[in-house]
Amino acid sequence: MVKSVLASALFAVSALAASRTTAPSGAIVVAKSGGDYTTIGDAIDALSTSTTDTQTIFIEEGTYDEQVYLPAMTGKVIIYGQTENTDSYADNLVTITHAISYEDAGESDDLTATFRNKAVGSQVYNLNIANTCGQACHQALALSAWADQQGYYGCNFTGYQDTLLAQTGNQLYINSYIEGAVDFIFGQHARAWFQNVDIRVVEGPTSASITANGRSSETDTSYYVINKSTVAAKEGDDVAEGTYYLGRPWSEYARVVFQQTSMTNVINSLGWTEWSTSTPNTEYVTFGEYANTGAGSEGTRASFAEKLDAKLTITDILGSDYTSWVDTSYF
């Protein structure tokens, strides 16, 4: 069964800063008690891959233990999670959880992900997405984002190592939460803009990095910008001062900027670190900061990092046409 809704974008705009407890007209409904389907995977399987119409899924309150795959589609797909406040992740009522290790997934990062998204132009609202495999599993993703013009609004991503893979295309993360320990915002080719995101580090490592950008050449357009966000320890966790770095270069042309972001003293005074002693990958990196605040923004930074004279803009990263696919009601 396929249901289309052409007014979904209008629904998203009108729902901002309000509750979303009922499905918009025409949406496929997922509910633990029934709905159209009881699993998210079955609802996605019911979508048409060939229609150019917008297709919408609404997920009712509950915890769904499944691995979700949204394949490439011809038209836009919008997924809404039930929430008491569309403007934030704090009141989300839908959690998707799964636990699979890198080894059990055939040594594929992507195949460990709780939510694998390869749909261009997809919009995801108010979902908690967790990989609960933990420290023993090493790489274990919550999200694997592999397509252009993807937007995540009021979402909560939790894991330990490699929580969020922003791999290809232009991507937006806004009013969201990202938690992890090791390289937990990573990828190779995406241009990703993170705004008003609460980044939380967990206890456990003696030294670790938040980002690991894998841009490997001058011609690769990959860029991660964390804008107007916060960096701190996960609530209740005891993280020693200076344990974490803002990033390390997965490849030698890595590009990451933190700007206008508040940082607690969990961030090391060097700010940034090498990939490893034997493979530093620092000669061509762009590791920048602008107008950050808090104890974690202080100190003498690594020699390969820089203080920027001006902030980057969203058009610098996502292009001048970003308003054609981004839900601008969140700005």
Swiss-Prot record:
The record marks 161 as: Transition state stabilizer. Pathway: Glycan metabolism; pectin degradation; 2-dehydro-3-deoxy-D-gluconate from pectin: step 1/5. It catalyses: [(1->4)-alpha-D-galacturonosyl methyl ester](n) + n H2O = [(1->4)-alpha-D-galacturonosyl](n) + n methanol + n H(+). Its main location: secreted. It comes from the Eukaryota. The keyword Hydrolase applies. Its EC number is 3.1.1.11. SUPFAM superfamilies: Pectin lyase-like. One of its GO terms (cellular component) is extracellular region. Keywords: Aspartyl esterase, Cell wall biogenesis/degradation, Hydrolase, Secreted, Signal. Substrate binds at residues 139, 248, 250. One of its GO terms (molecular function) is pectinesterase activity. It holds the Pfam family Pectinesterase. Gene3D superfamilies: Single-stranded right-handed beta-helix, Pectin lyase-like (2.160.20.10). The active site is at 162 (proton donor), 183 (nucleophile). The keyword Ligase does not apply. Belongs to the pectinesterase family. Involved in maceration and soft-rotting of plant tissue. This is Pectinesterase. It comes from Aspergillus aculeatus.
